[in-house]
């Protein structure tokens, strides 16, 4: 095994000297044994001349000193894969962090893998039911597709992801992989305890590199989670869900180490390799003829600016976008999905059918008309509208409230039991509201209910 010595340490970036002709390959993992018995993993990033490599540390470099011995493992970072990782919480290098003993994995995968070949890809377009009305109706997710949850701070991205994990595990008994990339440790802890309580933990693998971790871990933990998901797809022929919270932090971590690695910054100070790094990750998330990896990625939007290079680069890869809006959250409508801003590639009559498509378009049309009338209402008041427009506004407000829904994972906040609404129930409910069947019901009856029958029941108590 080749051995080198640390020659320089600058924050998370460590330079290591090796004998001439024994340089580790790019992306190979190096290991440092610390005096306290723990080890630190480094990943080779650059060759500087004949005898020196520049690496990025996956853990804090506290306690490292120049001259320490560094061992070349001769291969990239390996992630444990298979049934043994279900119900466990791992870090970026595959070590358990849940205090429940070693991981019983029969096999490991390199975290750097090439995307499936073109001939192995599946091109079938198929909808994936989530049980969340606003998503299933207006921006249906595709099986094996990529979906982005866009939103600023505190509009509900993580809660929506937790609800999706809950619905998939309970309704479809599918496997999920959750990669926590640079988010709050408290949220990871809450997620872990809620999964233990609800029993979905046995079908989920969790991989975390949170805010307190060095940028090396945050830039690689999404790849570790992806490798675990790829194993279930390629070797067990399963349909897997991959949740990444938050893909923006993946880019942010890359930009933190980029300058230390000596690269020139590009627009807004991001790394020049932004599009390449994002492409390498996103290209591996796909459906093959054997199985699929369906991904839902939370995307933090810095300062609510969708044109920032990080969210804009992610946009290009997505099949569906769910945009969470602060103005809708302020109305108290949760999930705070913007029905007019969110899109889906498969909202097409040839894929979802005419009934679904027509209902979705009618909902969008009535909401858009309401939006157009809001300026007039603000200036002149409701009384100045024509009778026809008054009816549009009344129905649109009911539709807007009916797009809200009580979540299983938010029962503690709302005091209401969660609801999973089947697609046909969703379509039926919205069709009836738009057709005017429920014009006599108060609009509050439609707020935080599941099916249209529940709204009718609720109206009786108001």
Swiss-Prot record:
It is found in: Cell inner membrane. Produces ATP from ADP in the presence of a proton gradient across the membrane. The catalytic sites are hosted primarily by the beta subunits. It catalyses: ATP + H2O + 4 H(+)(in) = ADP + phosphate + 5 H(+)(out). GO terms for molecular function: ATP binding; ATP hydrolysis activity; proton-transporting ATP synthase activity, rotational mechanism. It comes from Chlorobium phaeovibrioides (strain DSM 265 / 1930) (Prosthecochloris vibrioformis (strain DSM 265)). ATP binds at residues 151-158. Belongs to the ATPase alpha/beta chains family. SMART domains: AAA. It is a peripheral membrane protein. This is ATP synthase subunit beta. Keywords: ATP synthesis, ATP-binding, Cell inner membrane, Cell membrane, CF(1), Hydrogen ion transport, Ion transport, Membrane, Nucleotide-binding, Translocase, Transport. SUPFAM superfamilies: C-terminal domain of alpha and beta subunits of F1 ATP synthase, N-terminal domain of alpha and beta subunits of F1 ATP synthase, P-loop containing nucleoside triphosphate hydrolases. Its EC number is 7.1.2.2. Pfam families: ATP-synt_ab, ATP-synt_ab_N, ATP-synt_VA_C. F-type ATPases have 2 components, CF(1) - the catalytic core - and CF(0) - the membrane proton channel. CF(1) has five subunits: alpha(3), beta(3), gamma(1), delta(1), epsilon(1). CF(0) has four main subunits: a(1), b(1), b'(1) and c(9-12). PANTHER family: ATP SYNTHASE, ATP SYNTHASE SUBUNIT BETA, MITOCHONDRIAL. It is an enzyme of class 7 (translocase).
């Amino acid at each position: 095994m080749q051995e080198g010595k640390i020659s320089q340490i600058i924050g998370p970036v460590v330079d290591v000297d090796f004998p001439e002709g024994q340089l580790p390959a790019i992306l190979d993992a190096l290991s440092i044994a610390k005096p306290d018995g723990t080890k630190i993993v480094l990943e080779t990033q650059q060759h500087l001349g004949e005898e020196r490599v520049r690496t990025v540390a996956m853990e804090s470099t506290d306690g490292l000193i120049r001259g320490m011995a560094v061992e070349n493992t001769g291969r990239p970072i390996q992630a444990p894969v298979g049934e043994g990782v279900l119900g466990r919480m791992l870090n970026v290098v595959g070590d358990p962090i849940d205090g429940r003993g070693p991981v019983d994995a029969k096999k490991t995968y390199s975290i750097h893998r090439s995307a499936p070949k073109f001939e192995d890809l599946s091109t079938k377009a198929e909808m994936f039911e989530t049980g969340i009305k606003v998503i299933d109706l207006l921006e249906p997710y595709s099986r094996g597709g990529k979906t982005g949850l866009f939103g600023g701070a505190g509009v509900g991205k993580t809660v929506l992801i937790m609800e999706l994990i809950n619905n998939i595990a309970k309704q479809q008994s599918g496997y999920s992989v959750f990669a926590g990339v640079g988010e709050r440790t408290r949220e990871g802890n809450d997620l872990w305890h809620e999964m233990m309580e609800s029993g979905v933990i046995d079908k989920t693998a969790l991989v975390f590199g949170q805010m307190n971790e060095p940028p090396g871990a945050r830039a690689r933990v999404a790849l570790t989670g992806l490798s675990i998901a790829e194993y279930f797809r390629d070797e067990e022929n399963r349909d897997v869900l991959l949740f990444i919270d938050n893909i923006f932090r993946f880019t942010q971590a890359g930009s933190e180490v980029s300058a230390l690695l000596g690269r020139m910054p590009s627009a807004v100070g991001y790394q020049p390799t932004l599009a390449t790094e994002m492409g390498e990750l996103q290209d591996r998330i796909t459906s093959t003829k054997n199985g699929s990896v369906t991904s839902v990625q939370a995307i933090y939007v810095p300062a609510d600016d969708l044109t920032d290079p990080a969210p804009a680069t992610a946009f290009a890869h997505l099949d569906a976008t769910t945009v969470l809006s602060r103005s809708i959250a302020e109305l108290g409508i949760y999930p705070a999905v913007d029905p007019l801003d969110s899109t889906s590639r498969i909202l097409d009559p040839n894929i979802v059918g005419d009934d679904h498509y027509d209902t979705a378009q009618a909902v969008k049309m009535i909401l858009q008309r309401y939006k157009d009338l809001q300026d007039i209402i603000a200036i002149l008041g409701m009384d100045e509208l024509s009778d026809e427009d008054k009816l549009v506004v009344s129905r649109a407000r009911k539709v807007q409230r009916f797009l809200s829904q009580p979540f299983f994972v938010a029962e503690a906040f709302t005091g209401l039991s969660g609801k999973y609404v089947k697609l046909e129930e969703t379509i039926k409910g919205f069709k009836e509201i738009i057709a005017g069947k429920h014009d006599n019901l108060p609009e509050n009856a439609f707020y935080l209910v599941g099916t249209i029958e529940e709204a009718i029941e609720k109206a009786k108590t108001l």
